[in-house]
């Protein structure tokens, strides 16, 4: 295991009204304080870590919620823009719906605490983490997780914690706890580990193709800090300021009813559940449930909810027994067998890239769209990032599972699954310097029977390669499961779990990566934790499954396409002096808008992005239009030279000649003797203000003044086409120069998050 000193619990300080407890995490002090703020909550803890401050509260309702068959737990992260010294950027200038980041942070806290409430507990519990101050070097998501655990532990709500959580980074070959912002930039992984004193409960990771063994070591390294530092500190809080746990009413059917349900349903459910088809299996199980309800209705009146609960319990026991004792899964597969896989690309004609991935009865259609750098997502949250160049969005419509429900936009599950696939793919996305496009991939789940997030990873890889995105390596993903018998210690690790195995199993362990290593990992335990042995087996078994799936994908498309879709924009990159930017834009955008209008083809316009350093990106579906825009910009920024011919506009008349604007902000003088090859008595006899004339540069004197001639340009005037812009009579680019496409690295482009003076087009 790479070296690193696990931190230890610190000291406690009390006053008349507050109690605070400190510990060292990552070489910095974290303080948990209670008794001063939000005292009417069941439990309240203020977490201080560096300059970051998070208030965590937990409240439990007095009575169970009626009519539910689940534990109604809600975890919310409340981002406050004042925490980073900013005013919200929306029209109302106040916080609105939770951002995607806040939802992901809430899920990080929800997942490890949910398994630790009593079975049958139906009281509402709400955990709220309010971010009051943000220091980028001290992660508020971890503070919220620890604070929520502490608030629940010291409250009167029944909770079988505490849990703790840390971020583990890999910097210069060393594991680092809660890395600073600078360390995170250099880290090979971003691993969140949560667990109890005895076991790991939750893992969430993004990594740059890290080997499985290194990932396992990092998980266990983080758990050591949780076990030896965080848990003792929270337990000390509980011992000194914790409230006695309340007596609650648990949803618990009477023993005689349970016995009757077992006798009536066990054999029938054993037969009904063994069916490879999801819908047929669900219908058979539902039929058994209806029959048992009817048979027991007279003996146990008004017990429908208890019977339904017990039927699920018996079904769970039967599925788990068959897996552990017989090695047989509900659809008849072996423990390591992967469902049949089908892959296809180019299903859609106009989108820039599309890929279909089907594994058993899970089917995902992924679509890739390429945009300009001006299409990057503008972020308005508490993070340091300002823009986002690669996006993956996940949609899970109700028809994918044969259900109906209102379509209200992405929920927490969709946002979480989309972020997981995005994290898996991000390490292989080419940098902006190599591929100056914004990339958006959307995964449409068309059928679902488990592991749709990992199917999204596979489908997105197909779509990216079909679109011609030069990804570093293909990425595949697989979901692993676990069934463990706590009495005997026997367990089975399942490859490619389906929906029923996810619902009735003990673990959902998703692993995505390349042939080289892991790029994303997510694990959730539904029991009190897992051991190193099981984690190692799951990781190694997942690698075997991932390689099998990748082989099927590469048989469909072996590498990224060399050419982009004809409907994708081609990007021409050019560089001008920053001092010339105003010449290209013009007053109020007049010049650049004129370029866009004059290069329009049908309803399609070029898009022009100008960066602060003078880098210009011209995006055009029509190559000729993009090339014309490039030539016009080059003409605008090129300094006049003797012999060059321009079409300009007369701006002033003097007795000795006329001033002509040949470029935005650049005027030259046509002396009266140069107005015509005949004698001119008055300047007004030849030109007037506003006239368009063709002129030739005859001289640029030592003071930079430009002398022009209409007379010398007259032989060429018939061939010119006055347009108020430089004529294309200057040297043209040689064949091969200025062609669109990805520019080479080192072209002086700005980094992400540096918006230029303007983006125009579309």
Swiss-Prot record:
Domain KH: 569-633
Subcellular location per the Swiss-Prot or TrEMBL entry: Cytoplasm
Domain S1 motif: 643-711
InterPro entries: ExoRNase_PH_dom1, ExoRNase_PH_dom2, ExoRNase_PH_dom2_sf, KH_dom, KH_dom_type_1, KH_dom_type_1_sf, NA-bd_OB-fold, PNPase
GO biological process, one term: mRNA catabolic process
Alphabetical UniProt keywords: Cytoplasm, Magnesium, Metal-binding, Nucleotidyltransferase, RNA-binding, Transferase
Catalytic activity from the UniProt record: RNA(n+1) + phosphate = RNA(n) + a ribonucleoside 5'-diphosphate
Domain of life: Bacteria
Pfam families linked to this entry: KH_1, PNPase, RNase_PH, RNase_PH_C, S1
Positions annotated to bind Mg(2+): 502, 508
UniProt-listed Enzyme Commission number(s): 2.7.7.8
Statement: the UniProt record of this protein carries the keyword Lipid metabolism: no
Cofactor: Mg(2+)
Region (Disordered): 711-762
Compositional bias annotation for Low complexity: 729-747
GO cellular component term, pick one: cytosol
Molecular function as annotated in GO: 3'-5'-RNA exonuclease activity; magnesium ion binding; polyribonucleotide nucleotidyltransferase activity; RNA binding
Broadest EC class assigned to this enzyme: transferase
Family: Belongs to the polyribonucleotide nucleotidyltransferase family.
Main function: Involved in mRNA degradation. Catalyzes the phosphorolysis of single-stranded polyribonucleotides processively in the 3'- to 5'-direction.
Entry protein name: Polyribonucleotide nucleotidyltransferase
Classification lineage: Bacteria, Bacillati, Bacillota, Clostridia, Eubacteriales
Designated gene of the protein: pnp
